[in-house]
């Protein structure tokens, strides 16, 4: 009988150890879960504050109706606090811009790369001189494009810098044609 008693006692001890381990594991799991949920609840507002606010999102893209812009006319709209020039170029201006040799340009870029395919007459550029940030004047200068009154940079009808201290062409913002007469900038 002594063998049986020892066996029963061993089993009893094993059973007690398992229940203590089980309770301990449950408590650790519960405490860890509460800590993880607490950390997530604390970090959520912090991470969410990094998202842009509603007023910034409102300015992130604009739609522009092109139907009122006559051939040969340049219109200025405001996007993200910057002036954007939208030009409805004449066929002569397009041909003139495409005839320019790349070796003549300070910042070589093909005219076709500055416009959307199928909409070659529409040129959309950010209206800030790449030298010191002045706003160039449309249809001015020796190249009948833009002229920066601050330091004399001159851009052609494709917005490419041709003369002066500006190191780069007028930037082209991200834009898409929603229809033949409407674009979305941004």
From Swiss-Prot:
Question: Which UniProt keywords are given for this protein, alphabetically ordered?
Answer: 2Fe-2S, Cell membrane, Disulfide bond, Electron transport, Iron, Iron-sulfur, Membrane, Metal-binding, Translocase, Transmembrane, Transmembrane helix, Transport
Reactions that this protein is recorded to catalyse: a quinol + 2 Fe(III)-[cytochrome c](out) = a quinone + 2 Fe(II)-[cytochrome c](out) + 2 H(+)(out)
Q: Respond yes or no to whether keyword Magnesium is given for this record.
A: no
Documented EC number(s): 7.1.1.8
Does Cell inner membrane appear among the keywords?
Answer: no
**SUPFAM superfamilies reported for this sequence:** ISP domain
Binding of [2Fe-2S] cluster occurs at 129, 131, 148, 151
Q: What Pfam families does the entry give?
A: Rieske (PF00355), UCR_Fe-S_N (PF10399)
**InterPro entries on file:** Rieske_2Fe-2S, Rieske_2Fe-2S_sf, Rieske_Fe-S_prot, Rieske_Fe-S_prot_C, TAT_signal, TAT_signal_bac_arc, Ubiq_cytC_Rdtase_Fe-S_su_TAT, Ubiquinol_cyt_c_Rdtase_Fe-S-su
Q: Which GO terms describe its molecular function?
A: 2 iron, 2 sulfur cluster binding; metal ion binding; ubiquinol-cytochrome-c reductase activity
- Record localization: Cell membrane
Give the EC class as a word: translocase
- Membrane-spanning regions, if any? 27-47
What does UniProt give as GO cellular component? plasma membrane
User: What's its membrane topology?
Assistant: Single-pass membrane protein
- Which cofactors must be present for this protein to function? [2Fe-2S] cluster
The SS bond pairs are: 134-150
Summarizing the function annotation, the protein's role is: Component of the ubiquinol-cytochrome c reductase complex (complex III or cytochrome b-c1 complex), which is a respiratory chain that generates an electrochemical potential coupled to ATP synthesis.
Complex formation:
The main subunits of complex b-c1 are: cytochrome b, cytochrome c1 and the Rieske protein.
Misc remark:
The Rieske protein is a high potential 2Fe-2S protein.
| Name this polypeptide is given | Ubiquinol-cytochrome c reductase iron-sulfur subunit
